[in-house]
């Protein structure tokens, strides 16, 4: 089981995703979905909710949040987040197991990542599962748990990109079919750097 689990709810006219917060790592095997409560504003759901509201204000391509739910029990809490689904959204792993992506799509991803970084947005788990292409072939980022707006760009931007590249290489090594080549990464980075150069 991953760190978070998502259910798809709503109807065709208003599809939404409901994500329950689960712990990952070793502690997640002992305490699956309980977190220490030290105030509402410190909860994972509240912080992600506030971040997604800010990203929407900045018109960045991230999931539009609908509601957050925090249930306190003694000294701990459980939490959920309800978001609108990205119309026609498919993550990069799903896409790349089917067929190669065009240079234009790789450029779109690179440009989008640069726009988030120009807005000082830190994504704590940037990987191929957390980037979606929508029905119009526009890139969206999802899962901003533990993300934040930082004071300025720095080494964390490169760390984000390094994490994403490791994710592509991990899928390439683990999946029987995954259409990713180093030239794809070069195309992504060229678009990323070109966007960063624009004031």
Language model region names:
Residues 87, 128, 146:
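Short, glycine/acidic-enriched loop or turn micro-motifs at the edges of active sites
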Residues 91-100:
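AlphaC helix of the protein kinase catalytic domain
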Residues 1-90, 114-118:
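Conserved ATP-binding subdomain of kinase catalytic cores across diverse folds
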Residues 139-199:
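C-lobe/activation-segment region of protein kinase-like
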Residues 79-84, 138-144:
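A short beta-strand motif that forms the metal-chelation/ATP-contact edge
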């Amino acid at each position: 089981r991953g760190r978070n689990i998502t259910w798809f709810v709503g109807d065709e006219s208003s599809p939404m995703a409901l994500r329950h917060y689960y712990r990952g790592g070793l502690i997640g095997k002992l305490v699956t979905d309980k977190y220490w409560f030290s105030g509402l504003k410190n909860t994972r759901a509240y912080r992600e909710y506030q971040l997604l509201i800010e990203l929407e204000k900045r018109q960045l391509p991230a999931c539009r949040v609908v509601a957050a739910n925090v249930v306190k029990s003694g000294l701990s809490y459980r939490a959920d987040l309800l978001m609108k689904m990205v119309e026609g959204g498919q993550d990069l792993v799903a896409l790349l197991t089917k067929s190669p992506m065009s240079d234009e799509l790789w450029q779109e991803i690179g440009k989008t990542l640069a726009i988030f970084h120009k807005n000082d947005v830190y994504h704590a788990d940037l990987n191929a599962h957390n980037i979606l292409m929508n029905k119009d072939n526009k890139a969206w980022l999802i899962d901003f748990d533990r993300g934040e707006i930082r004071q300025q760009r720095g080494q964390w931007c490169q760390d984000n990109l390094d994490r994403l590249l490791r994710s592509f290489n991990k899928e390439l090594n683990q999946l029987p079919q995954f259409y990713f080549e180093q030239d794809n990464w070069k195309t992504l980075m060229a678009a990323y750097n070109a966007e960063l150069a624009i004031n």
